[in-house]
Amino acid sequence: MSIDISTLFYELVAAISLYLATYSFIRFLFKPSHHHHLPPGPTGWPIIGALPLLGTMPHVSLADMAVKYGPIMYLKLGSKGTVVASNPKAARAFLKTHDANFSNRPIDGGPTYLAYNAQDMVFAEYGPKWKLLRKLCSLHMLGPKALEDWAHVKVSEVGHMLKEMYEQSSKSVPVPVVVPEMLTYAMANMIGRIILSRRPFVITSKLDSSASASASVSEFQYMVMELMRMAGLFNIGDFIPYIAWMDLQGIQRDMKVIQKKFDVLLNKMIKEHTESAHDRKDNPDFLDILMAATQENTEGIQLNLVNVKALLLDLFTAGTDTSSSVIEWALAEMLNHRQILNRAHEEMDQVIGRNRRLEQSDIPNLPYFQAICKETFRKHPSTPLNLPRISTEACEVDGFHIPKNTRLIVNIWAIGRDPKVWENPLDFTPERFLSEKHAKIDPRGNHFELIPFGAGRRICAGARMGAASVEYILGTLVHSFDWKLPDGVVEVNMEESFGIALQKKVPLSAIVTPRLPPSSYTV
């Protein structure tokens, strides 16, 4: 008689799971209450807690729950206590008043399998190594002085993007521009030139003719979107650790696959960069600086190659996906609200004219366009839920007891749609930021009504770069082209696709018509 090993295995798994479930259920029933005065929230179920309530769009589900339970609510997600802040006052309490207590992040499957076991800057433990990584980025890439130093790179790469779009618009039958691909093309090469001193990505159709390219932009864009999607998923194993090894959703498997692809790409970049190091001896780029940091002890800390790769992964993914998604949403809103696009064109024509490209120095003189950017950050924040934080110690927030090791989620999407803060929050109305009430609100983390980059000491390190890139690239696209939908398309599909970054479910395609002289579309 033969024995079916696979059947025995699954029966064993089922038996162990049943035992653990029964054990946990009994503990749940008879465990004494030490809840003090926790924030209100849904009860959930034994073992799984409130996980099923999150659905496929957790930011929307959590916003709906906050209407019932309040702006500070407590959920048990599996075995993990989680507090959710859903209005500006609650966000300020956690991200400013109690910022130090929530300065670390939980180490889950995402940081483990995608970010080299949290050896990057985004997920690293709050401490000396995180501070060194952040300092290096600020000094050489993301700080105000660094942004000035590489402003010419931004102008040049936007020029390459405009050239590609102009060529597509000039064909006998204009080809619709796939907006996210063009944005990734510009932003990834912008970051590549700062880090590597070269343009690592090309339009897919031109890959064979480019000897220096590391990858096609469409391939890279797919990898970035997959990584950001997976990193935003609620993995059951993160919240019920004793079944994590089963990988019931297949998320860990998929994370390992996409991380391997990035690792191959990053290793290739570093190898090629090392081989040409002598050419940059007198003018080192950011990767040269990082590699030097692996050979020296800086402030008692020494980086290693894993830290370098993990940081490059942060910069190439977050540096392209978050800003490009905001720009895509803004263009989608303007295509659905033609009067907003027309008013932006009128303002730009009055201030800039139509004989040259927009410059960064023009933006302060374009208040209506700036209002469009802010309104997009409000309604379509690049990160709908902040990356989770975790409390180091128990604390009291607004009269509620928050236990030690409680996860914190700030629902940035819900804050931007809070009807107590924003009149008609579901409408796309840039004019609201021209009123005295909201005119001085800035998206860089100081006004908790609008925190698309987060706030506090773990605010997005690229907030300054992200805000400036959105303004400059979106402004250039609006000023340089007229925009219309492809034939047969009446309205832009505005459905969301959830992840760390909030993408459009259907990528935006549009027909563009040049508004400036042909010389404006050359590099």
Curated annotation (Swiss-Prot):
Keyword NADP: yes
One GO process term, biological-process aspect: anthocyanin-containing compound biosynthetic process
UniProt: heme binding residues: C460
Its EC number(s): 1.14.14.81
Protein's name according to its UniProt entry: Flavonoid 3',5'-hydroxylase
UniProt keyword Metal-binding, yes or no: yes
The protein's required cofactors: heme
InterPro entries: Cyt_P450, Cyt_P450_CS, Cyt_P450_E_grp-I, Cyt_P450_sf
Function: Catalyzes the 3'5'-hydroxylation of naringenin and eriodictyol to form 5,7,3,'4',5'-pentahydroxyflavanone and 3',5'-hydroxylation of dihydrokaempferol and dihydroquercetin to form dihydromyricetin.
Chemical reaction(s) catalysed: a 3',5'-unsubstituted flavanone + 2 reduced [NADPH--hemoprotein reductase] + 2 O2 = a 3',5'-dihydroxyflavanone + 2 oxidized [NADPH--hemoprotein reductase] + 2 H2O + 2 H(+)
Pathway annotation from the record: Pigment biosynthesis; anthocyanin biosynthesis
Family to which the UniProt record says this protein belongs: Belongs to the cytochrome P450 family.
UniProt keyword terms in alphabetical order: Heme, Iron, Metal-binding, Monooxygenase, NADP, Oxidoreductase
Residue ranges crossing the lipid bilayer per the database entry: none
Entry-linked CDD domains: CYP75
Enzyme class: oxidoreductase
Source organism: Campanula medium (Canterbury bells)
GO molecular-function term, one example from the UniProt record: heme binding
